């Protein structure tokens, strides 16, 4: 893929962030998601690529746009798989919380796992602890391994996990081990990425969340030199049947190369609300400001991009709830 595609994808996540940010704290997650999705779809039409959505807003009969199988781009350029989450953390934005993002991952055609929309058990770490974690090992063993890799005591390790009833046992084990815990209400893509940046204070991600988000996280962590390991967790016979039809082995531990093959991949995200990693959208008069992250796996280059947007010249993004 052309390296210039990186900045084209930032334009897409910026548009989705600007369009949805007006809904912050207004309690209307569906409207916010619709705004992000529509803006993202519009800008995709200008991107020089021949893209196919492999992870999106649902099947063709479930979503009006950015559905699985939809063609994206202007029809020129590389043939790529596209994974999108137009608004990672709809509940976060609706309540005015932290870490809402707009997210895209693009990779060579046929290299992204077409993850079904179901739960995935996950464990993720940054570069210092790659090769140390085991998704089937006890919590305490993983904590000790990460502590050793990062030259810390277990009591100094910070684990992040979605604050869900299904995670009560893991949270109890983390507390019993003496680790520090950062509970997150939504948005485990941000939680996974945070493990790769020292200033976020996060060392390891535990727990289950969406499988599509696991693939998005894998692209980011591959580019950052980190690691995520997953295992599909179907919750019904229907989901089990769907996995079998897709040829997915439910007993298989999914490692980085299973989630995203090779290193010709790009990850882009823009903050919608403030978070540990990215500042959220700010508005002042006719100007909107954004902070984005774009990472290219092939080169390992990480860029933080500050954007200042004249909303007078982007009337389609001026949304008044």
Swiss-Prot record:
Residues that, per the record, bind Mn(2+) 1: 33, 57
E.C. no: 3.1.3.11
Keywords of the record: Carbohydrate metabolism, Cytoplasm, Hydrolase, Manganese, Metal-binding
Record-linked CDD domains: FBPase_glpX
Disruption phenotype: Disruption of ywjI alone (or fbp alone) does not affect growth on various carbon sources. But the ywjI fbp double mutant is unable to grow with carbon sources demanding FBPase activity, i.e. glycerol, malate, and a mixture of succinate and glutamate.
Pathways per UniProt: Carbohydrate biosynthesis; gluconeogenesis
Reported induction: Expressed at the same level under glycolytic or gluconeogenic conditions.
Alphabetical GO biological process terms: fructose 1,6-bisphosphate metabolic process; gluconeogenesis; glycerol metabolic process
Activity regulation (record text): Inhibited by phosphoenolpyruvate (PEP).
Keyword field contains Metal-binding: yes
Function (record text): Catalyzes the hydrolysis of fructose 1,6-bisphosphate to fructose 6-phosphate. Can functionally substitute for the FBPase class 3 (Fbp) of B.subtilis.
Name of the molecule in the record: Fructose-1,6-bisphosphatase class 2
Gene name in the database record: glpX
């Amino acid at each position: 893929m052309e390296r210039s595609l990186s900045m084209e994808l930032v334009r897409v996540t910026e548009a989705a962030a600007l369009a949805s940010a007006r809904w912050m704290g207004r309690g209307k997650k569906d409207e916010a998601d619709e705004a992000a999705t529509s803006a993202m779809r519009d800008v995709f039409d200008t991107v020089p690529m021949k893209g196919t959505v492999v992870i999106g807003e649902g099947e063709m009969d479930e979503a009006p746009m950015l559905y699985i199988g939809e063609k994206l781009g202007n029809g020129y350029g590389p043939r790529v798989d596209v994974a999108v989450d137009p608004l990672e953390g709809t509940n976060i934005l609706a309540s005015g919380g932290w870490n809402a993002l707009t997210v895209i991952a693009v990779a060579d055609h046929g290299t992204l796992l077409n993850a079904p929309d179901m739960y995935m058990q996950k464990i993720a770490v940054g570069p210092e602890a790659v090769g140390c974690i085991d998704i089937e090992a006890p919590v305490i063993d993983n904590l000790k391994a990460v502590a050793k890799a990062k030259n810390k005591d277990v009591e100094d390790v910070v684990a992040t996990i979605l604050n869900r009833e299904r995670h009560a046992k893991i949270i109890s084990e983390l507390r019993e081990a003496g680790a520090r815990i950062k509970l997150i209400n939504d948005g485990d893509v941000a939680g996974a990425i945070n493990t790769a940046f020292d200033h976020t204070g996060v060392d390891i991600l535990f727990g289950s969340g969406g499988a599509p988000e696991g693939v998005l996280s894998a692209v980011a962590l591959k580019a950052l030199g980190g690691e995520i390991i997953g295992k599909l967790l179907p919750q019904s016979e229907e989901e089990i049947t769907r996995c079998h039809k897709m040829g997915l082995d439910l007993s298989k531990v999914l490692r980085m190369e299973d989630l995203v093959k090779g290193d010709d991949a790009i990850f882009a995200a823009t903050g919608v609300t403030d978070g540990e990693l990215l500042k959220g959208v700010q508005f002042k008069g006719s100007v909107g400001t954004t902070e984005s992250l774009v990472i290219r796996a092939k080169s390992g280059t990480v860029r933080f991009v500050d954007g200042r947007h004249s909303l007078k010249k982007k009337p389609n993004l001026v949304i008044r709830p």
